Every structure is written in structure tokens, then in C-alpha cells.
Design a protein with these regions (language model features):
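Structural recognition of the beta-strand scaffold that forms the well-ordered cores
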Residues: 67-71, 86-91, 98, 123-125, ...
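Internal "kinase-insert"/substrate-recognition segments embedded within catalytic cores
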Residues: 76-77, 91, 113-117, 130-296
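Regulatory N- and C-terminal appendages and interdomain linkers associated
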Residues: 1-52, 403-430
Length: 430
């Protein structure tokens, strides 16, 4: 017997063991399994094997309601979102109203930001037990139907003839922080992540990479990077700029020394240009439209983690600039969190001293473009969310999004309220 709430598709997941204990114990653990996806009327949309199911996230792993990442045996188009193997189920555990992530992703897509993940609300059952309302969406990754830039890791792996994780790691410092790719002091080589020294967590001008012997001729792209908020070392390829700005190279996730130092050099020059207020140098290194658009979006939605957590960048190839995006993980927005003990800033909710947007907003040309973009692009979209817009933007209002998941939301909270009550603000409250 299959159970459903009204109005939403339902995803039924089954682990091979029939238990969730192994995967819930650690996000390093995974299982195989099966999945069944049905529409709101109970018609089968997809049925097949899972080569992987595991929990995902950082702080969300501490909650009873877990977020999941699943990998299908073969690419499939789920709910009209395009073919892919890897999919993410966001738990929206901080959001006591549930649609914040949906609103954010739809808003940025309407604003024209590139590579925004499509998303659909679904009910999820695991091993026959109802887990709640989730947001099914694509993983942030390089791919033809995802972030459509060159797959440098695939090319590197083909060149070396073996899986890149089989290689050890190399780490070191940049002797001249302004040009790390030109002057490098390699400290040592180790066989595993656990052997990397603790000082890599803290010092500026440090980096780590896979100790890979061969590099493609062109290593100018593509790269996908994420700001690393916490001082942990859980990924092979990473670096820290002068200001303490930490970045993880998500793709190629097993980047070589040459690859890490190449992209490190670009980000260090960006870091220096921002610190020195050198807008001419900065404009030659970054895609200003994407950076400004991302900032306006963060400020409009009052993102508590603006610029410091779940913040992505990508670089295509050649002389292409560093683009800001795609957007990801927006359940901590629109009044959920407050930091009352800190001074207000141009980004309102920023509270990290090395935060990207806190520093870049000191450049007046950046803010001039931000004001223009808000007036011409974002304000009409914001009015649509409030149900007050005169333009047909194609966006559903907050009230419409909430109504669409109302039955599922009621079911979700029958399992308990997973968020912090002290941090909850209903969407639309002042």
C-alpha cells in the first residue's frame, strides 16, 4: 500500500539493507537501493535502481530530518527537470514554512542568473516510513545539463589512465601570495586527507591538491569552487587567500597541483583587487553582472549566510572571467535568523569578517550597478512574490507557493517541528 498527501509527487526510497541506520550514522556511509517516483494521481513516473543513497549537508546532518543525495543507475528525467544521475533531496529543515528554497531558486531563474537548478516539492518515504516534504533538485556540478563548462577532471583522468583518488596529496604555501602559481614552496606529500597538517586550516597562502603526474595542455577551465566557511579539511583541493578567504575546488574535485595553483592565482588577484579598491583590475577578472546580480539577490532575500556559506563560483576556460553562482541552499533567508549584537552592513545579514560581499560593496561602481539592477530586474520580481506586481513575470507568489504544498506541509510537521523555534519567522512577517 502506498500513501500520499494531496497535490504533490511522491518519492519512495528503499535501501538494500532495509534500514536507515548505516547511512544516518555518517554522511560518509552509503548504500545501494531502489526508488519509485509517482505523480499526484499515483501514476508511476520512474522506477529503478539506486547505485548510491547517503545523507548530505553540514549543519542539517544534526537534525532528525536528514537531507539526502541519490545516484541513479542511469540518467533519468525526473519531473521534467532534465536527465541526470545525481539528485539532491533538500530537507528545508531550518524553514518552518518550507517554500523558502523554492522561492529563492525560482526568483533567480526569473532574474536570468545562469545554471539555476530546477526544483520540485515532493513527499519522501524511506523504507516505508514517511520522512516529510522535500525539495528534489539537481546537484551543483559540471555537466551538459548542469553547469555547462569543460570537465577538466574527466580529461585529467583519461590522460593519467587511472582514478585520480588513487593518487596521494601535495600541499604547501605560496611564497609570494600575489602570484601563487608562479612562486611555490611545496612543503610535503602525504597519502591521505587525514595526514594533512592542521595548519592548512588556518594560515593564509596555503593550498592542497592531488599529487597527479600529468596535466592536460590547457588547464584554464572549467572550475567550480565553493567558499569554505569552516576550518576543516574534507576535500583534496583547496586554498586560502591573503584575507583568510577559503575556497574549495569542487570540480575538478581531485585537482592537480598545477590546476589548484592556476585557479588560486586568479582568486588571489581578485582578493587583492577588492582589498585595494582596484576596480579596473577587478573588472578584468570577474563577470561583474553575475557578481552584482548575486549580491542584489542575497540582500533582497536577507540571506543569513550571504557570501560565506553555500557560495559558488565557476570559470569556463581561456580568459573567461570568474562568474558568481549558481545559487544554492536558501532555507536560512527572509527573517529566519538575526544577529543583533553586530553592526549593520551593506549586506544586512553578513557577519563574517572576510565575507566576499561585505568587502566588495565598498566599491561604489559595484553599488551603482546593484541599485540599477534592483530597480530594473529584481524589484518587479519581488512584487510578483508579494502578489502585487503588475508585470507578468511567470513567478508564483509566496501565498501561491505556500498553498501548493499546504497538505504536505501539514503531514511534514506531524512528524515534529525540526527547526529552531527561536529562529523561526513566518514568511511575510516583519
Amino acid at each position: 500500500m502506498l500513501y500520499q498527501s494531496s497535490g504533490l509527487p511522491t518519492l519512495y526510497l528503499q535501501t538494500a539493507s532495509g534500514s536507515e541506520k548505516k547511512i544516518h550514522d555518517s554522511k560518509k556511509n552509503e548504500e545501494t537501493g531502489t526508488m519509485l517516483l509517482v505523480d499526484a494521481e499515483g501514476n508511476t513516473l520512474h522506477m529503478g535502481a539506486l547505485s548510491r543513497i547517503r545523507i548530505r549537508g553540514n549543519s542539517t546532518t544534526l537534525f532528525a530530518k536528514k537531507a539526502y543525495q541519490i545516484k541513479l543507475d542511469a540518467k533519468a528525467d525526473l519531473l521534467g527537470m532534465g536527465k541526470a544521475k545525481t539528485w539532491v533531496l533538500l530537507a528545508n529543515v531550518i524553514d518552518g514554512t518550507l517554500p523558502r528554497n523554492t522561492l529563492a531558486l525560482n526568483l533567480t531563474r526569473a532574474a536570468g542568473l545562469p545554471f539555476i537548478s530546477p526544483c520540485r516539492a515532493v513527499d519522501v518515504y524511506l523504507n516505508g516510513e514517511y520522512k516529510g516534504n522535500y525539495l528534489l533538485c539537481e546537484k551543483v556540478q559540471i555537466g551538459k545539463e548542469r553547469i555547462a563548462i569543460h570537465d577538466l577532471e574527466e580529461e585529467t583522468e583519461l590522460l593519467n589512465g587511472q582514478d585520480l583518488p588513487a593518487y596521494g596529496l601535495v600541499y604547501g604555501t605560496a611564497a609570494q601570495l600575489g602570484t601563487p602559481e608562479e612562486s611555490v614552496n611545496v612543503t610535503s606529500r602525504v597519502k591521505s586527507l587525514s595526514k594533512l597538517p592542521d595548519w592548512l586550516k588556518m594560515k593564509p597562502g596555503v593550498w592542497s591538491a592531488r599529487d597527479i603526474p600529468l596535466d592536460p595542455t590547457d588547464i584554464s577551465g572549467g572550475y567550480l569552487l565553493e567558499v569554505a566557511l569552516k576550518n576543516n579539511i574534507s576535500t583534496p583541493a583547496r586554498f586560502t587567500c591573503d584575507s583568510g578567504w577559503k575556497l574549495v575546488v569542487r570540480e575538478p574535485g581531485n585537482a592537480s597541483q598545477a590546476q589548484v595553483l592556476s585557479i588560486f592565482g586568479i582568486f588571489q588577484r581578485i582578493d587583492t583587487a577588492i582589498a585595494q579598491g582596484d576596480r579596473d583590475t577587478l573588472s578584468g577578472l570577474i563577470d561583474m553582472d553575475s557578481w552584482v546580480g548575486k549580491y542584489v539577490f542575497e540582500a533582497l532575500l536577507a540571506n543569513f549566510n550571504a557570501g560565506a556559506s553555500s557560495q559558488y563560483f565557476y570559470k569556463a576556460s581561456g580568459d573567461d572571467p570568474i562568474c558568481c553562482g549558481p545559487v544554492w541552499d536558501y532555507d536560512n533567508i527572509l527573517g529566519i535568523s538575526e544577529v543583533l549584537s553586530l553592526q549593520d552592513t551593506p549586506t544586512a545579514h553578513v557577519h563574517y569578517p572576510y565575507d566576499l560581499f561585505l568587502r566588495v560593496t565598498q566599491l561604489e561602481p559595484f553599488m551603482e550597478q546593484a541599485r540599477t539592477m534592483y530597480r530594473d530586474v529584481h524589484r518587479p520580481l519581488a512584487l510578483s512574490l508579494l502578489g502585487e506586481g503588475e508585470e507578468d513575470t511567470g513567478l508564483r507568489s509566496i501565498a501561491e507557493e505556500a498553498a501548493a504544498i499546504s497538505a504536505s506541509r501539514d503531514m511534514n510537521f506531524l512528524r515534529g517541528r525540526h527547526y529552531h523555534e527561536s529562529r523561526l519567522t513566518e514568511i511575510g512577517d516583519s
